[in-house]
């Protein structure tokens, strides 16, 4: 005999059938578990639950590592020795050095580490320094999650990869490298430029303000470590469109970058003095902090071990890398970043419009479309940076922090199968945990970075589609 169906009365007094609950069986319970797991791995709507978990786990993991894993001194003592000299009044970069060498970073680095100097009792209180870097890593993850979820089709598994790098935790809380602050600043730049894209349709002036703040923070990133310059082409392109292709507003945004450099480096640049001593101090600052000809030691390279030391140290190899960087970057710029399907107009029209004083941006420009613009901005910044990383003269172990935050998103942007992406992520992590690097590890690293860039370029859907429909991506799960 079947169970009678229950009924309830609605507001009009009419009887309606109550919804039937699924029968409590092992099969149904297992089905719910499978659906839940699928939701928090593949469904973009799951990000609202996954993001808080990612942030919480990052905070917990950093604290556990600080407690359980011994700190390793590499450069922090040297940083503190250099800062001590600055605090004592030394402003000549030629006279500022520590145990592992002279100061080689701009004035933003000095100001940040002066603050760390004050918080850690001159570097003696390492535990406090580690805690600060732990909070920095957690804050960086917060903003990375914001940047990722500004793209509505980012799947949760991409966010989970942010937890997966052993080397990255080491760079932050066991080494205390200044690269971490540059990375945090550039993640901030990404979010501000994404916000400029999102709000453009509401107010172009708000978008302009976000571009200003982004340029300010970009210059601060450069003042900490000049690897942030790798982003320059992307920042310039994005800023140009966020001000509506208005050349006058664009000039204002660009002017922010050198202005901030002057203000941050004021006491080392001595702009109000023109005597011989001031000129020498100014030159020493510029030459040490922004030395593009710096030589790297072969024993520390992570990416070029397979080419041999003689080739690595040769000027021809350096020129080859520079040429490759320029060619690949221009290829991406003209075939993807400035493609008419993105900008709404041809390259030739863009050039002609650039000489007009008023706004000339196309209404079809995807970079100012709140639906897809934030995703494209992250994509352009990430690919530009990773191209620079691929052709870097050398990658040292702390340099992983330059781009590790972007790799999960780029893997997702290739459109490759989920399992393939996980395997590549694992292989990439392996290359950074082999010490010292080997021929095999460096070959795999260069191969993965090259493959990800090729895969991202080939996936036209991620660049040109009006809206990425989640259902269309299920075949890649």
UniProtKB/Swiss-Prot annotation:
The protein's annotated pathway: Protein modification; protein glycosylation
Membrane topology note: Multi-pass membrane protein
Cytoplasmic side: 70-131, 194-203, 244-247, 338-371, 428-433
Record field: transmembrane: 49-69, 132-152, 173-193, 204-224, 226-243, 248-270, 317-337, 372-392, 407-427, 434-454
InterPro entries xrefs: Glycosyltransferase_ALG3
Signal peptide boundaries: none
Keyword Acetylation attached: no
Reaction(s) the record says it catalyses: an alpha-D-Man-(1->2)-alpha-D-Man-(1->2)-alpha-D-Man-(1->3)-[alpha-D-Man-(1->6)]-beta-D-Man-(1->4)-beta-D-GlcNAc-(1->4)-alpha-D-GlcNAc-diphospho-di-trans,poly-cis-dolichol + a di-trans,poly-cis-dolichyl beta-D-mannosyl phosphate = an alpha-D-Man-(1->2)-alpha-D-Man-(1->2)-alpha-D-Man-(1->3)-[alpha-D-Man-(1->3)-alpha-D-Man-(1->6)]-beta-D-Man-(1->4)-beta-D-GlcNAc-(1->4)-alpha-D-GlcNAc-diphospho-di-trans,poly-cis-dolichol + a di-trans,poly-cis-dolichyl phosphate + H(+)
Superkingdom: Eukaryota
Enzyme Commission designation: 2.4.1.258
Annotated localization: Endoplasmic reticulum membrane
Keywords, alphabetical: Endoplasmic reticulum, Glycosyltransferase, Membrane, Transferase, Transmembrane, Transmembrane helix
A GO-annotated cellular component: endoplasmic reticulum membrane
Residues in compartment: Lumenal: 1-48, 153-172, 225, 271-316, 393-406, 455-477
Cystine residue pairs: none
One Pfam match: ALG3
Transcription regulation among keywords: no
GO biological process: one example: dolichol-linked oligosaccharide biosynthetic process
GO function terms (MF aspect): dol-P-Man:Man(5)GlcNAc(2)-PP-Dol alpha-1,3-mannosyltransferase activity
Principal cellular location given in the protein's record: endoplasmic reticulum
Function, as annotated: Dol-P-Man:Man(5)GlcNAc(2)-PP-Dol alpha-1,3-mannosyltransferase that operates in the biosynthetic pathway of dolichol-linked oligosaccharides, the glycan precursors employed in protein asparagine (N)-glycosylation. The assembly of dolichol-linked oligosaccharides begins on the cytosolic side of the endoplasmic reticulum membrane and finishes in its lumen. The sequential addition of sugars to dolichol pyrophosphate produces dolichol-linked oligosaccharides containing fourteen sugars, including two GlcNAcs, nine mannoses and three glucoses.
Protein name in UniProt: Dol-P-Man:Man(5)GlcNAc(2)-PP-Dol alpha-1,3-mannosyltransferase
Protein source organism: Scheffersomyces stipitis (strain ATCC 58785 / CBS 6054 / NBRC 10063 / NRRL Y-11545) (Yeast)
């Amino acid at each position: 005999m079947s169970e009678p169906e229950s009924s309830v009365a609605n507001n009009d007094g009419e009887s309606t059938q109550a919804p039937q609950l699924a029968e409590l069986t092992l099969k149904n319970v297992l089905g719910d578990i499978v659906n839940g797991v699928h939701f928090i791995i593949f469904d973009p709507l799951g990000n609202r639950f996954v993001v808080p978990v990612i942030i919480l786990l990052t905070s917990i993991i950093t604290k556990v590592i600080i407690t359980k894993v011994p700190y390793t001194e590499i450069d922090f003592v040297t940083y503190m020795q250099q800062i001590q000299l600055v605090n004592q009044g030394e402003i000549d970069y030629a006279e500022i050095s520590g145990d592992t060498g002279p100061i080689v970073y701009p004035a933003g680095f000095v100001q940040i580490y002066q603050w760390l100097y004050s918080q850690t009792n001159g570097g003696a209180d390492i535990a406090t320094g580690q805690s600060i870097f732990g909070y920095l890593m957690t804050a960086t993850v917060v903003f990375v999650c914001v940047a990722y979820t500004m793209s509505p089709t980012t799947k949760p598994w991409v966010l989970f990869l942010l937890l997966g790098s052993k080397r990255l935790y080491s760079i932050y809380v066991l080494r205390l490298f200044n690269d971490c602050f540059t990375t945090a600043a550039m993640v901030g730049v990404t979010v501000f430029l994404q916000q400029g894209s999102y709000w453009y349709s509401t107010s172009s002036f708000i978008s302009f303000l976000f571009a200003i703040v982004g340029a300010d923070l970009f210059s601060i990133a450069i003042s900490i470590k000049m690897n942030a310059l790798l982003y320059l082409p992307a920042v310039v392109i994005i800023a140009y469109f966020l001000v509506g292709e208005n050349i006058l507003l664009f000039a204002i945004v660009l002017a922010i970058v050198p202005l901030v450099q002057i203000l941050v480096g004021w006491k080392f640049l001595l702009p109000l003095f023109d005597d011989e001593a001031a000129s020498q101090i100014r030159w020493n600052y510029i030459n040490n902090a922004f030395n593009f000809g710096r030589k790297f030691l072969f024993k520390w390279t992570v990416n070029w071990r397979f080419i041999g030391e003689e080739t690595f140290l040769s000027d021809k190899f350096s020129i080859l890398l520079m040429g490759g960087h320029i060619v690949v970057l221009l290829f991406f710029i003209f075939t993807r970043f400035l493609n008419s399907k993105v900008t709404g107009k041809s390259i030739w029209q863009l050039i002609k419009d650039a000489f007009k004083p008023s706004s000339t941006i196309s209404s079809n420009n995807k970079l100012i479309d709140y639906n897809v613009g934030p995703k494209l901005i992250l994509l352009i910044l990430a690919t530009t940076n990773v191209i620079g990383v691929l052709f870097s003269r050398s990658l040292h172990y702390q340099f992983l922090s330059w781009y590790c935050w972007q790799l999960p998103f780029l893997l997702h942007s290739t459109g490759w199968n989920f399992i393939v992406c996980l395997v590549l992520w694992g292989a990439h992590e392996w290359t950074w945990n082999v010490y010292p690097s080997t021929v095999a590890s460096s070959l795999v690293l260069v191969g993965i970075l090259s493959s990800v860039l090729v895969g991202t370029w080939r996936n036209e859907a991620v660049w040109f589609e009006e809206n990425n429909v989640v259902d269309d991506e299920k075949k890649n799960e």
